Amino acid sequence: MAKFEQKLTDLLRPAVEETGKTLHGIEYISAGNNSVLRLFIDHENGINVDDCAEVSRQVGAILDVEDPISSEYSLEVSSPGVDRPLFELAHFQEVIGETINVKISMPLNGRRKFKGPLVAIENDTLIVEVDSIDYELAISNIDKANLVAKF
């Protein structure tokens, strides 16, 4: 997780938890005046639109006071969904055996994108099987990862 996103997570997690929800993760997409701060929230009973609105109000008040983002941005609050993003080691541990998409920063064997079952996690390294080959991907090298939905 990027340092800025970690700072936002630390700032906003208590506000989300105050509503009885869990902050699954944060994405900040910087695009000039079209930047987006996206919060993914979760709850054991699921998330509905009222939950998102409640968290948006709570978090919006903190962002207005603390003002951690100097440029204009849109705040989006949603559930992680069936293709949930994976941000933390615990998220990966929950989906061992499932198919995931991973995009890494520094290429490994000439590739940056991997899609396959998460076979194991060893010492902060994911082992993802792609075309019968096990790739070892350092969690610190991951740009983005998500669960592949089963239908």
UniProtKB/Swiss-Prot annotation:
Q: Does the keyword Lipid biosynthesis apply?
A: no
The record's listing under InterPro entries reads: Ribosome_maturation_RimP, RimP_C, RimP_C_sf, RimP_N, RimP_N_sf
Per UniProt, the keywords (alphabetical) are: Cytoplasm, Ribosome biogenesis
> Gene Ontology cellular component?
cytosol
Q: Domain of life, per the record?
A: Bacteria
Q: Tell me, which GO biological process terms does this entry list?
A: ribosomal small subunit assembly; translation
Name the major location. Answer: cytoplasm
Query: Has the keyword Manganese been applied to this entry?
Result: no
List localization entries.
Cytoplasm
By its UniProt entry, which NCBIfam families does this protein fall under? PRK00092.1-1
- Provide the function of this protein: Required for maturation of 30S ribosomal subunits.
Family label: Belongs to the RimP family.
User: In its UniProt entry, what is this protein called?
Assistant: Ribosome maturation factor RimP
List the taxonomic lineage.
Answer: Bacteria, Pseudomonadati, Pseudomonadota, Gammaproteobacteria, Alteromonadales
